[in-house]
């Protein structure tokens, strides 16, 4: 499965994660391919001034088309928690849903 497939599945399920307006509002950029565990990495603005960016690990659920943000083992969100692409990649590659 490719990111194009993920985008289409999300849209077909009636969701807007990848819509132009949604991505523009959050300043979201997709910065990785889809990993085997259905995760991928985004870069988003960390503030409304749009000066800083951080990385988040996202999870695609093929059975529903939903995309959500991965969680750490303590249940906290990974949204904008990675300051480097390398740290986000390591987490994404090793992610196992709870």
Positions of predicted regions on the chain:
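Short N-terminal "domain-start" leader segments
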Residues: 1-71
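A short, charged, amphipathic alpha-helix used as a generic interaction element across diverse proteins
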Residues: 70-98
């Amino acid at each position: 499965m490719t990111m194009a497939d993920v985008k289409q599945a999300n849209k077909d399920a009636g969701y807007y994660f990848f819509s132009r307006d949604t991505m523009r509002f959050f300043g979201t950029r997709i910065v990785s391919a889809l990993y085997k565990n259905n995760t991928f990495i985004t870069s988003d603005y960390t503030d409304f001034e749009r000066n800083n960016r951080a990385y988040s690990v996202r999870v695609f659920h093929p059975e529903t088309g939903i995309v959500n943000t991965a969680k750490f083992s303590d249940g906290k969100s990974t949204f904008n928690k990675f300051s480097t692409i390398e740290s986000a990649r390591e987490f994404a590659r090793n992610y196992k849903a709870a």
